[in-house]
From Swiss-Prot:
Location within or outside the cell: Cell inner membrane
Claim: rRNA-binding is one of the keywords in the record: no
Function description: Fluoride-specific ion channel. Important for reducing fluoride concentration in the cell, thus reducing its toxicity.
Similarity field: Belongs to the fluoride channel Fluc/FEX (TC 1.A.43) family.
Activity regulation statement: Na(+) is not transported, but it plays an essential structural role and its presence is essential for fluoride channel function.
Cellular component, GO annotation: plasma membrane
Protein name as annotated: Fluoride-specific ion channel FluC
Pfam families found in the cross-reference section: CRCB
One of the record's GO molecular function terms: metal ion binding
InterPro entries in UniProt: FluC
Intrachain S-S bonds: none
Binding-site list for Na(+): G76, T79
Length: 126
């Protein structure tokens, strides 16, 4: 990866992280046991990566820096596996096993479902 690739990843990651932070500021306090901002970031990221994979698979001639910007950078910065993990562990430590299970179901199941939906959406529109 050349210098432009590093810039693409960095710019994309900053933008994705800022959006994730904005979601957290707006929605996490609504229900501390299920921080909705983190959930929104992961579900949106899952959907968008499905769209992006479909797009880049059908536009293979684009410079690789665009994929680095969008997928590795932006969506990597937006989605929050480490935050999600710490929230599940916090639920477990607090004895909130139902909320921990709900986190797992919604984040993992929802993200997988929305990634498939994003890819399907792109293929239907292409």
């Amino acid at each position: 990866m050349g210098p432009l690739g590093f810039v693409a990843v960095g710019v994309g990651a900053a933008a994705g992280a800022w959006l994730r932070w904005g979601f957290s500021v707006l929605w996490n306090a609504i229900n501390p046991a299920m921080p909705y901002g983190t959930l929104a970031a992961n579900l949106l990221g899952g959907y968008l990566i499905g769209l992006a994979v479909g797009f880049f698979d059908t536009h293979a001639g684009l410079p690789p820096e665009w994929r680095l910007l969008a997928i590795t950078g932006f969506l990597g910065g937006l989605t929050t596996f480490s935050t999600f993990s710490s929230e599940v562990v916090a639920n477990l430590i607090a004895g909130d096993y139902g909320w921990a299970a709900m986190h797992l179901l919604l984040h993992l199941g929802g993200s997988l479902l929305l990634t498939a939906l994003g890819l399907w959406t792109y293929r239907m529109l292409a």
